[in-house]
Amino acid sequence: MTKYFSFCYRRPKMKNELTLRKLKNTAFPALYRCFMVNDTFANSDRAKILAVAAYLINLNDDILNRLGYRVIVEYCNQTQNYHALYDVAVNQGLYPISKFIEEHYALDGNRNFFTEWNDCFTEQFKQGDAYFTEEQKTLNTFFQNSSEESIAVVAPTSYGKSELIIEAVKEYADKRICIITPTKALLMQTKQRIRLSGVISKAKKIIVHPEMYNTNEDSCIAVLAQERLLRLLKKDDAITFDCIIVDEAHELLEENTRSNTLASVIIVATKRNPSIVLKFLTPFVADSSNLQPRYTTYDLKTFRISEYIKTEKFFFHDLKKGQGSYLYDQFFNDFYSLDCGVRDKGYEEQIVQILAGRKNIIYLNKPRDIERFALALAELLPNISDPEIDNACTHIGQYMQPQYNLLRCLRKGIIYHHGSVPDAIRIYIERLYKTLPTIKYVVTSSTLLSGINLPAEKMFILDGKKGKGNLSLESFRNLIGRVCRFSEIFNRDTGNLCMLEPEIHVVFGSYFSKNANGMEFLRRVAKVEAVLEDSVQNVLLTNTKIDDGNVAHLKEAQEFIENYEPGIIKDYDNRYTQTNIGKACILNGVREIDVFTEEGKMQAVADTYITKGKINNTDDLLEAIVKIFISKVSATASGADKLSRLERSEAQKFYSMLLEWRVSNKSYAEMIMLFVGYWRTLLQADRNAIIFVGRWGDLDAFGSHNTPYTMLAGKTRSQIINLAIVRIKEEQDFIDNNIIRFVEILNDLDMLEEQFYKKIKYGTADDEIICMLKNGLSLSLSKLLKDNYRQYVDINISRSTVIFSDDLLAAMAKNEENNILIYEVENCM
């Protein structure tokens, strides 16, 4: 293979008439099939297929180039002879590959002038401890040269979008910059990366909560979800930003409340500062002009990554029909039968156990299925003898309850990850998974699609759904891009070029819908010829087609924007709010009520409460929220069924109880037992008692759909405790995302007693604890720091800043505080 080193220079692409379709009609597919499934393969055949690959990779056809690259990577991994891949990597600017080969595989006997020259040339692509590809370096240069221009960056996972954010923060550190992230988890991850990068001083505040902002500050760095940014824009109607970065910007295309809100804040920010610089970061979008909201006029430059380093291997395991295992080839759109040693296995957990690598992501759509599968897999695996896992289980058991299902899984090297796992637990177990080699499995949902990075060399897809719909081509590619990140492939100690071929296993079994066609699903999302097309649905985007089906929605969105920020829409001739409560509803993002129709009635009811004096207890608060707002919710509004539950007296009592726990600052462990005790009283009063449990339910009641209720009778104590754990998280989210909006409106109207308002919103009236909450700490941790470690924490209430002493972690460890709380501090430092 030394002959390949004579080609280590740039070769122009050859003109050709060969296409993939024509190639399919040659003898090559049969040869390729034997090669890919590792059938007996003569050396002469290897030489043939490598020669064809060398030809394909130099043609002027992207798909054939990719096929040629696929063959070369597979050939080198089969033979462990990486000379050909070295040549390709140098020619195509894939310098992380060429450098890894140079450092890990013996090339000494094949060195010549070209290899020495390439070695020196590659050094200019070194960034810190890593090496960039040619397009990565070009992207960085483009980003730096476009610091004052609005741009869209379309780049797969691992291409350094986090570094681009840090570069922008460095550029705008003395101005006003906001990074919009779609989830709280990504928000905290982004904040921590900015801190660790060292581009800002330790004393510089990073705003993660609207109330951390002070109007007298000349500069600010904010990391916010769109809803929090909307509240910040409301808090100060004069605030402007010099730069906004929209992470995971493809979510802007969707038609839902969050995407509408994202478009709205961009529109408002652009109106306040027409010279604002916008940076859209996304792993996929076909046409960046589709990211432009209405009522904005900025020009958008685009940088799109076109190179490829990874070439996935797709496996299909048919459990439904028992037809065995296949390698799916995305180039020839064909399934090659395999003997993986799993033909007689009938359950998903058996497939995963047998085929698992060192680190594995298992994808499922529903939280209920995630826990069910994780527990089933745990039954097959032995307990792990690891003091760190034992210690982690002890601390999680103390923080939650010892019967927590997660602990059964963790002892077997499994964690699970979904929206009903408490934030502090999720962050802690993610760290365990990243740092402990004994934890091999993470079972997760589409939360992984929102930028969360976890190491993995294999992925198992057990469900073809995302939410209520199917996994789209875009979501599928985003999902599989989370496997074998560059930092793992090219790690100097643990890296492996076999990870250039990430294994994606589609296990077609009981978690797929009954009428699903597994093979067609894989063809639809994995075929190399599948063309990415943007589905532009958000009515606030310029390129969304408006018709009879969405014109009313556009009108609602226009009314919201113009009432929130008057003057945006020229020749506006729709409605304006006429009352204080109507204006407050708009400013607090209430969209479930036709505010313009109902505001007079809402104001009249509010006035009756105002005459009675300020509200200072949870019973009166819930009653006021129901009478003023919930009774006016439109039956067709998104989430109307969840809000309408509050009209039932039992629900009002229940949420009044939850708010009392909030006011009393109950710990998670305390709330679990209070939940269990509350349900026990219901069961004692009525053996047929049913409770609302949302997506964890199995029956309908009170006119509901989608089985959101369940019976208490017949459940074990462990089942009830685990049901309480997920319901507490979901009910807390419901309160924060729904009820607190109405609390804010009542407070805007001066209807709440101040100390009571603080306790409802924050769980405390202590201003120092509130300051820590605004900085992203949990209530239990904030209270602990205030009570026991105040000397290690510098709290500035007027500036909304919290600075931790370097000695804090050691002091907490010395006092044997719960590791979850210690890591939470570490994550916020």
Q: Where do the language-model regions lie?
A:
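N-terminal helicase ATP-binding lobe
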Residues: 1-829
